[in-house]
């Protein structure tokens, strides 16, 4: 099922910065928030508890990648935080992904990273020594993710349709690199607008700087949300 709220990437260096940002929004507004490595390492698990206590949904974006037992144990801890979604690297293998699913349980969605949206095909081939196309690599990882029993993948919006064809229509495709038209793309190579992401079949979109660094973050959020949901029935 598609998520109507754009997921806001809380790319802040401290707990206080998050509090200042969230204070801009009405207290009754429930947001979907992404906590990444920078914030989690700066603020610790308490940041997740804080956001959940405010009534927000949380995507904990730590991209775990380790041996199966270690990932399973880590996921058991994360399950206690009440996160709504978290992720791992598909490159860790099917056994690692299965272990992660077992450790997390079924109360939260578990998705896998295929190829980072900052990765170009040339970079993948040169540094990862994967001698296929970028799309073929993404499809391979998506199939293995589905085989492992996960809920979906993180992928570029350009890859959503082929991933759903290769897996199933309900397989979640969460797409970062979403930018409204006219906004700088930053360090992401494969980007798309919210409206385009909807048309191509994305289930979740992640937006960071176009909201968090906007002159009016609340207005920017609602403009992106309106664009994302404008064609929903």
Curated annotation (Swiss-Prot):
Keywords: Decarboxylase, Lyase, Pyrimidine biosynthesis
InterPro entries reported for this sequence: Aldolase_TIM, OMPdecase, OMPdecase_AS, OMPdecase_bac, OMPdeCOase_dom, RibuloseP-bd_barrel
Biological process according to GO: 'de novo' pyrimidine nucleobase biosynthetic process; 'de novo' UMP biosynthetic process
Active-site residues, Swiss-Prot/TrEMBL: 63 (proton donor)
Enzyme Commission number(s) of this protein: 4.1.1.23
UniProt pathway annotation: Pyrimidine metabolism; UMP biosynthesis via de novo pathway; UMP from orotate: step 2/2
Protein's UniProt keywords contain Lyase: yes
Enzyme class: lyase
GO cellular component: cytosol
Pfam annotation, one family: OMPdecase
GO terms, molecular function: orotidine-5'-phosphate decarboxylase activity
Binding-site residues, substrate: 11, 34, 61-70, 117, 179, 188, 208-209
Catalytic reaction annotation: orotidine 5'-phosphate + H(+) = UMP + CO2
Assembly and binders: Homodimer.
Family under the similarity heading: Belongs to the OMP decarboxylase family. Type 1 subfamily.
Function: Catalyzes the decarboxylation of orotidine 5'-monophosphate (OMP) to uridine 5'-monophosphate (UMP).
Protein name according to UniProt: Orotidine 5'-phosphate decarboxylase
